[in-house]
């Protein structure tokens, strides 16, 4: 039986009419929250990765648009229900374009737009704005519940598999940050780790530093230290040596988009881990809510991979000084996501509905069938 959940870090502070987001680009050296007052504020927070993690991006976007709309109504900038409706639709389109790879943002705002389209625009501006606020708050609350289910299903499945070869406690390898900082609470992949820790079944979690933004080193380790979760930080390039020399029971990662055939877009370096896990016989799992499933995209070949500024590789994040020599024949390639083929997800896809293992033959996953499950 799983133990009750503990309090975790919060990157999203919301009360009706007010939203503050933790600036994750400054962690762990500074803890700074920024108020979101306008739609432009939430767009910038997502684009500049002050808020990051597919679930957190979607939740923050919904709440940010809600707060910005309410403020405009309160100051009289939006005077009618039809003006509010038009502003909401335009805002959803605007924020949707802030980051292209994570499907949660697109799905969330697409669904919200569909509901806004059905609003009665003849009602007063305040009532139309309030209706959207309630929708956004429901998105926030739902994400917490999804994470709780993911962590329980994932921990139980991994423990059951480990017991088959005599392991009572497990060691997990992960990448990037998929915890409370990347979601509304608890996390997806790191949520599974949390549940193992709460149940006293975690031997250790190994966290890849996750260059170039160091989300593993800056954020995952930060969460683990705050809660006393046993954690070892490794360089990204040490993963193969770790799997060879230490007992790793499973690799558990998050996702920004899971295509119909199981191909998974996630933080750059995830594909590397999947290849290494396959070679070393370590089960590889992806943990994500069904909000991250994209049955409309056939495979990873059709996913737009975001590329970011070369300075993220060439410049020290803290000092802002360039640490790489420059020259006319030097080029920098900085994709921030990669595609892990579904066939390499050997353990399964963990969602709030349970753990879906791979089929024996291609395609190894049928994402539409997972979405359709009750």
Curated annotation (Swiss-Prot):
The keyword Metal-binding does not apply. It catalyses: 5-(methylsulfanyl)-alpha-D-ribose 1-phosphate = 5-(methylsulfanyl)-D-ribulose 1-phosphate. Its main location: cytoplasm. It is an enzyme of class 5 (isomerase). GO terms for cellular component: cytoplasm; nucleus. Its EC number is 5.3.1.23. InterPro entries: IF-2B-related, IF-M1Pi, IF_2B-like_C, Initiation_fac_2B_a/b/d, M1Pi_N, NagB/RpiA_transferase-like. Keywords: Amino-acid biosynthesis, Cytoplasm, Isomerase, Methionine biosynthesis, Nucleus. The record marks 176 as: Transition state stabilizer. GO terms for biological process: L-methionine salvage from methylthioadenosine. SUPFAM superfamilies: NagB/RpiA/CoA transferase-like. It comes from the Eukaryota. The active site is at residue 256. The keyword Nucleus applies. GO terms for molecular function: S-methyl-5-thioribose-1-phosphate isomerase activity. PANTHER family: METHYLTHIORIBOSE-1-PHOSPHATE ISOMERASE. Catalyzes the interconversion of methylthioribose-1-phosphate (MTR-1-P) into methylthioribulose-1-phosphate (MTRu-1-P). Belongs to the eIF-2B alpha/beta/delta subunits family. MtnA subfamily. This is Methylthioribose-1-phosphate isomerase. It comes from Leishmania braziliensis.
């Amino acid at each position: 039986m799983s133990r009750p959940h503990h309090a975790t870090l919060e990157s999203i502070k919301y009360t009706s009419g007010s939203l503050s987001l933790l600036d994750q680009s400054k962690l762990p050296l500074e803890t700074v929250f920024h108020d979101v007052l306008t739609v432009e504020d939430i767009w910038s927070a997502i684009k500049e990765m002050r808020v990051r993690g597919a679930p957190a991006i979607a939740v923050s976007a919904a709440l940010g648009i809600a707060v910005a709309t309410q403020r405009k109504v309160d100051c009289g900038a939006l005077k009618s229900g039809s003006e509010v409706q038009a502003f909401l639709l335009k805002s959803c389109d605007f924020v949707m374009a802030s980051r292209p790879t994570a499907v949660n943002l697109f799905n969330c705002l697409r669904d919200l737009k569909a509901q806004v389209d059905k609003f009665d625009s003849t009602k007063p501006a305040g009532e139309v704005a309030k209706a959207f606020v309630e929708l956004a708050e429901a998105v926030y609350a739902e994400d917490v519940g999804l994470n709780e289910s993911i962590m329980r299903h994932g921990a139980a499945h991994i423990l059951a598999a480990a017991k088959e070869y005599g392991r009572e406690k497990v060691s997990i390898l992960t990448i990037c940050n998929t915890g409370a900082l990347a979601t509304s609470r608890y996390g997806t992949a790191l949520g599974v780790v949390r549940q193992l820790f709460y149940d006293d079944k975690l031997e250790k979690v190994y966290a890849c530093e996750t260059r170039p933004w160091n989300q593993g080193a800056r954020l995952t380790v930060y969460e683990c230290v705050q809660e006393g979760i046993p954690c070892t930080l490794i360089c990204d390039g040490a993963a193969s040596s770790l799997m060879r020399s230490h007992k790793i029971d499973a690799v558990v990662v998050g996702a920004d988009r899971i295509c119909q055939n199981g191909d998974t877009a996630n933080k750059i370096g995830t594909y590397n881990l999947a290849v290494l896990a396959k070679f070393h016989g370590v089960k590889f799992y992806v943990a994500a809510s069904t909000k991250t499933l994209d049955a409309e995209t056939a495979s990873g070949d059709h996913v737009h991979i975001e590329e970011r500024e070369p300075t993220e590789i060439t410049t020290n994040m803290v000092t802002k000084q360039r640490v790489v020599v420059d020259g006319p024949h030097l080029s920098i390639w900085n994709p921030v996501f990669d595609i892990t083929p579904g066939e390499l997800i050997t353990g399964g896809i963990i969602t709030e509905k349970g753990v879906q293992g791979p089929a024996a033959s291609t395609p190894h996953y049928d994402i539409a069938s997972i979405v359709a499950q009750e």
